[in-house]
Amino acid sequence: MIAIIDYGMGNIRSVEQALKYIGAAYIVTSDKEEIFRSDGVILPGVGAFPKAMDILEEKDLVRVLQEIGRSRKPLLGICLGMQLLFEKSEELQDCNGLSLLPGVIRKLKVPYKIPHMGWNELKKEGEIALWNGVEDGSFVYYVHSYYADCPNEIVYGVSDYGVEVPGFVAKGNIYGAQFHPEKSGDIGMQMLKNFKGVVETWKSSQLSI
């Protein structure tokens, strides 16, 4: 069972539809016990970083997500949800994030239209489980005005938008997509299927303990 975190700022409906399409069992929840009982977690998000962190704090979900992230349970952040995984953001004000990944969220300063919205090529950097069946140079769908300034060793996919935008990051059990896999057609569905596979592998490992 995958828990989709509902904190009032997520693209919940589209993520739900995507998981339903790939046949993944899921629950939409903000209940701490349900999240801890899940086999994997998706943190979606659309909107402002500081407001999102305030809401997560109010719901006592900061602690929950940090515990999930520091365990071996698979966690996938999408768009703003990915950005929240980092140490802090410069959006509106300096604001601390979940600190599960090293790096800072900075505003895009490019000679192009902001937000970066639409399809862009994703170049793979290294191999991870979520790349199974995903071709290098596939196109994915973005909507964002901020990007992750983070160490190269956690970057597994990049797109060019005047700067090199980390499109996909990963460290251990933690994954983050700056783009929207649930809106990225067959390629996005393949990535979510791969995440489902990672979740199932983790679940099986727990049953054998």
Swiss-Prot record:
SUPFAM superfamilies: Class I glutamine amidotransferase-like (SSF52317). It is found in: Cytoplasm. One of its GO terms (biological process) is L-histidine biosynthetic process. It comes from the Bacteria. PROSITE patterns: GATASE_TYPE_1. Gene3D superfamilies: 3.40.50.880. InterPro entries: Class_I_gatase-like, GATASE, Imidazole-glycPsynth_HisH. GO terms for cellular component: cytoplasm. Pathway: Amino-acid biosynthesis; L-histidine biosynthesis; L-histidine from 5-phospho-alpha-D-ribose 1-diphosphate: step 5/9. GO terms for molecular function: glutaminase activity; imidazoleglycerol-phosphate synthase activity; lyase activity. It catalyses: 5-[(5-phospho-1-deoxy-D-ribulos-1-ylimino)methylamino]-1-(5-phospho-beta-D-ribosyl)imidazole-4-carboxamide + L-glutamine = D-erythro-1-(imidazol-4-yl)glycerol 3-phosphate + 5-amino-1-(5-phospho-beta-D-ribosyl)imidazole-4-carboxamide + L-glutamate + H(+); L-glutamine + H2O = L-glutamate + NH4(+). The keyword Mitochondrion does not apply. Keywords: Amino-acid biosynthesis, Cytoplasm, Glutamine amidotransferase, Histidine biosynthesis, Hydrolase, Lyase. Residues 1-205 form the Glutamine amidotransferase type-1 domain. Its EC number is 4.3.2.10, 3.5.1.2. Pfam families: GATase. The active site is at 79 (nucleophile), 180, 182. Transmembrane segments: none annotated. IGPS catalyzes the conversion of PRFAR and glutamine to IGP, AICAR and glutamate. The HisH subunit catalyzes the hydrolysis of glutamine to glutamate and ammonia as part of the synthesis of IGP and AICAR. The resulting ammonia molecule is channeled to the active site of HisF. Heterodimer of HisH and HisF. This is Imidazole glycerol phosphate synthase subunit HisH.
